[in-house]
């Protein structure tokens, strides 16, 4: 298998952004897997060549990356990640040519770091995460698996973010706080103190608006 061959899973808007990142990182994109009704169509310059049921036939030909977005719920991204793993496939870890990831930081498999993002020394980012455009993951911060840190967000030093968390665009996490699992933080929020109850938070300071059942 050529380690630079890549199959994208999910053909929406996030897929277009990941295509640009993958091209900048030197990947050879073989095609996109999407819904049955999309087969034969194109996403930018790349054909939709099948559905996620076709993952097993590409395991020996390419790595995979999940290109379904995550705003309200990570369930589809988690399902795709697990489907690749169950098929014996490998998930690529992709860093845009314009991003900076410290050699003292770690990234989990299936994670993509988008253009102009920074992951600083000592930071740990889990599996199947989106570190979106212009994000800053500061020193010694920990991001759990299956998270989306959205555009322009600042995760300050020593923060800990649990699994399956979405942090909306241009939000700020104050130094050293903890965000629990299965939490959504609305765009433009300032999380000044640690939060743990599952639900939707927003505002400055960020407060719980909707508690998950």
Where are these regions (language model features)?
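Short amphipathic alpha-helical segments
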Residues: 19-21, 77-80, 125, 196-197, ...
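Phosphate-bearing ligand-interacting subdomains
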Residues: 40-96, 100
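Short helix-capping segments at alpha-helix termini
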Residues: 26, 85-89, 193
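Short alpha-helical
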Residues: 13-14, 72-75, 106, 190
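Hydrophobic, well-ordered beta-alpha structural blocks that scaffold small-molecule cofactor pockets
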Residues: 1-43, 49-52, 56-57
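Cofactor-binding loop segments of dinucleotide-utilizing enzymes, especially the Rossmann-like FAD-
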Residues: 11, 34-35, 69, 96, ...
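Structural signal for interior beta-strand "rungs" in well-ordered beta-sheet cores
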Residues: 93-209
């Amino acid at each position: 298998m050529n380690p630079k061959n890549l199959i994208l899973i999910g053909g929406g808007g996030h897929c277009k952004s990941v295509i640009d990142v993958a091209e900048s990182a030197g990947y050879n994109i073989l095609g996109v897997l999407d819904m049955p009704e999309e087969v034969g169509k194109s996403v930018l310059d790349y054909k939709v060549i099948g559905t996620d049921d076709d993952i097993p036939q590409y395991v020996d030909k390419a790595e995979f990356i999940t290109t379904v977005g995550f705003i309200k719920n990570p369930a589809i991204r988690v399902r795709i990640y697990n489907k690749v793993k169950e098929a014996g496939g490998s998930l690529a870890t992709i860093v845009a040519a314009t991003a900076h990831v410290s050699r003292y930081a770690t990234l989990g498999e299936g994670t993509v770091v988008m253009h102009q993002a920074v992951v600083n020394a000592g930071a740990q980012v889990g599996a199947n995460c989106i570190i979106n455009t212009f994000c800053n993951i500061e020193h010694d911060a920990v991001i759990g698996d299956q998270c989306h840190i959205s555009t322009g967000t600042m995760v300050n030093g020593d923060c800990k973010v649990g699994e399956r968390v979405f942090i909306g665009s241009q939000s700020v996490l104050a130094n050293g706080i903890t965000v629990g699992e299965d939490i959504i933080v609305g765009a433009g929020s300032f999380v000044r103190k640690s939060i743990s109850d599952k639900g939707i938070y927003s505002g400055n300071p960020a407060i719980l608006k909707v508690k998950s059942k």
